[in-house]
Design a protein with these regions (language model features):
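Conserved N-terminal catalytic core of the sugar/cofactor nucleotidyltransferase
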Residues: 1-59, 64-66, 70, 98, ...
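A short alpha-helix-loop-beta-strand transition element characteristic
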Residues: 5-8, 103, 142
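Conserved beta-strand termini and adjacent loop/short-helix elements that scaffold enzyme active sites
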Residues: 17-19, 81, 164-166
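Glycine-/small-residue-rich active-site loops that bind phosphorylated ligands and cofactors
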Residues: 23-24, 59-60, 88, 171, ...
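Short aromatic/basic micro-patch
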Residues: 29, 61, 125, 145, ...
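Conserved core of the sugar-phosphate nucleotidyltransferase
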Residues: 47, 61-129, 133, 137-138
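Left-handed beta-helix
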Residues: 129, 136-353
Length: 353
């Protein structure tokens, strides 16, 4: 694991610790802090002085060594990475109130009336004995979470807590809308989060596949396309994964299409997220009409997006509205008069039967 990033080392590397239920009284991870609690024995085996806690759904570039130096210089028990946000957006975040020396005086989890615009990034450095003591004290806390439980516990117990201020690009992509936004920002003329900076390049696994092919009559504008793609249509302001096939007459705008997906001929796709290994038939329209609240979960399936899950099939000739969700192999009879109206869903398993 981690070969493309030089993480398959004898010392260090990456270990995946997935949640699973063992015999006895163990359980699936019920919160961010509970996940660490259930792996305390693994962490203890390394006898660390410090533990760095990160979220897996954030995008940023940070030199953690600088943050660790800040933690050591202040003899901190807990250091929280923070960044300033517009005050009108501050209620979406855990908010830190710190003095001129960056010592934290208060912490508010998503306050209605925030007293500061310094937002927690969900990145923490703990001195391991302090974190271990907090996790043991909170082991019976339901859905134990760092922002809601561990940080307040440390503050209430007078731990030395400091705010490390970060001013680079950072984006939480924990929702479909923010995930779509982050991808669209990558195709800006000068992206704020630049994958190609000489001094800090972003590497990934390089599969040995054929190069991108754009056919005569095909057109690609302000987009990122992976290797192995074949484009016979028009792609604009989109992010396309590897081995995607785009048929003649297809028009794709403001969309994310993941690897190994096939798009038919004369298809129109607007503002959609299509997962891996899907098949979209000929003469299909995705993203038409007005936005309507999603009937399954309007907070998740929103932002005017069409969301199609992995291994799904969309039959020829159908029209699909905004704020919709589709998963599974679907057939013409699943679409009333050939249409899935805005806000509706089709969720199937396996072959759709």
């Amino acid at each position: 694991i981690g070969i493309p990033w030089d993480l398959d080392r004898n010392n260090g590397g990456v270990a995946i610790l997935p949640p699973y239920e063992k015999s006895g009284n163990s359980e699936w991870y019920t919160g961010t802090a509970n996940a660490i609690y259930q792996n305390m024995r693994y962490i203890d085996s390394y006898n660390p002085d410090y533990v760095l806690i990160l979220s897996g759904d954030h995008i940023y570039k940070m030199d953690y060594e600088v943050m660790l130096d800040f933690h050591k210089e202040n003899n901190a028990d807990v250091t929280i990475a923070t960044m300033p946000v517009p005050i009108e957006e501050a209620s979406r975040f855990g908010i830190v109130i710190a003095d001129d020396d960056k010592r934290i005086n208060a912490f508010e989890e998503k306050p209605v009336h925030p007293r500061s615009n310094l937002a927690s990034m969900g990145i923490y450095i703990f001195s391991w004995p302090v974190l271990k003591e907090a996790l043991l004290a909170l082991k019976d806390q339901e859905n134990c979470d760092f922002g809601k439980h561990v940080i307040p516990y440390c503050f209430e117990n007078d731990r030395r807590m400091f705010a490390y201020e970060f001013n680079g690009y950072w984006k939480d992509v924990g929702t479909l809308g923010s995930y779509w936004e982050a991808n669209m920002e990558l195709v800006d003329l000068i992206p704020e989060f630049n994958l190609y900076e000489e001094y800090w390049k972003i590497y990934t696994k390089n599969d040995a596949i054929e190069p991108l092919y754009i056919a005569k009559g095909g057109h690609v504008e302000r987009s990122i396309m992976g290797e192995g793609c074949e484009c016979y249509g028009h792609v604009e302001h989109s992010v396309i994964g590897a081995n995607v096939k785009i048929g003649r007459g297809a028009v794709i705008r403001d969309s994310i299409i993941m690897c190994d997906t096939e798009i038919g001929s004369n298809v129109t796709i607007d503002k959609s997220i299509i997962a891996e290994n899907c098949k979209v038939g000929d003469n299909v329209t995705l993203g038409f009409g007005q936005e309507k609240p999603n009937v399954l979960n309007e907070s998740i399936y929103s932002f005017g997006l069409v969301t199609i899950g992995e291994d799904s099939v969309i039959p020829d000739g159908v029209k699909i509205g905004k704020n919709t969700a589709i998963s599974g192999v679907t057939y013409e009879e699943d679409y009333k008069d050939g249409v899935l109206e805005g806000g509706e869903v089709i969720i199937k398993a396996g072959d759709g039967k």
